């Protein structure tokens, strides 16, 4: 059954972003699902931890075998400050799992507390991204091709974490809730081998009465061929130090394409 769900997720993702290769030369496509045995050592539940800082260490380095996609983590003063953690935690209980100690929980309306079927299309695992660029530094989560070869990141699926959704709706001691007329956006910026920007794609991630609560397709194909993509979160919800929302989100089923040799 798990294998069938994995295949279904791959087919669904490939179909959603099929236009990435239309009218082009012979292309190869892979969907990075974060499922299977090669990912098991990196899943947060293997560490018995629900908090990014308890999982992400300098030795926490994963790489997809089919595409060489990897996600280097950023540390400041010895502490995790931005990057990715593979997770399977999912819940609809914002009161219990809506603070920073459970920042690895993705929102799933169907489960009160589970470590299965929280990913896109009922899969089990996904990435939790954390970090942004601000006056305090550049801590944007980055997806990079470790072999340095440029590929097209056609798209992925995004969802809210319980932590983000709880603060967006209810606020907390460090951030107000999203008010009428305010919004939060996520951005993906592509870079070529020379470090030049290839473009930026922006999605409205949350407004007062319109928040992402399910896996939602995000088309990144306009970035073109890239060696890395940096993700950012911005918005006009602020405290005295600037943007105040938790800079967390989930992504899954990253579709990658490259020219066949």
Positions of PLM-derived features:
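N-terminal targeting leaders for non-cytosolic proteins
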Residues: 27-140, 148
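Terminal, low-complexity interaction segments
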Residues: 180-261
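Generic short beta-strand segments
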Residues: 158-164, 232-237
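Extended extracellular/luminal ectodomain segments enriched in beta-structured repeat modules
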Residues: 148-155, 225-226
């Amino acid at each position: 059954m798990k294998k069938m769900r994995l295949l279904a997720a791959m087919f669904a993702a490939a179909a959603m972003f099929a236009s990435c290769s239309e009218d082009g030369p012979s292309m190869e496509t892979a969907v990075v699902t974060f499922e299977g045995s090669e990912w098991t050592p990196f899943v947060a539940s293997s560490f018995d931890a629900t908090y990014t800082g308890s999982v992400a260490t300098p030795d926490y380095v994963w790489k997809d075998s089919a595409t060489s996609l990897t996600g280097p983590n950023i540390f400041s003063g010895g502490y995790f400050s931005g990057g990715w953690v593979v997770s399977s935690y999912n819940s609809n209980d914002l009161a219990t799992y809506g603070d920073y100690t459970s920042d690895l929980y993705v929102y799933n309306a169907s489960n009160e507390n589970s470590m299965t079927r929280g990913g896109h299309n009922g899969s089990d695992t996904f990435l939790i991204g954390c970090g942004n660029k601000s006056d305090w530094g550049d801590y944007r989560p980055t997806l990079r091709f470790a072999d340095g070869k440029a590929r097209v990141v056609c798209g992925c699926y995004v969802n809210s974490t319980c932590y983000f959704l709880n603060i967006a709706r209810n606020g907390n001691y460090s951030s107000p809730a999203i008010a009428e007329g305010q919004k939060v956006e996520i951005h993906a910026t592509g870079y070529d081998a020379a470090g030049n920007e290839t473009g930026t794609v922006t999605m409205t991630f949350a407004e007062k009465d319109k928040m992402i609560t399910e896996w939602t397709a995000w088309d990144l194909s306009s970035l073109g061929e890239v060696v890395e993509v940096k993700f950012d979160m911005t918005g006009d919800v602020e405290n005295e130090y600037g943007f105040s929302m938790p800079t967390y989100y989930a992504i899954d089923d990253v579709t990658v394409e490259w020219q066949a040799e």
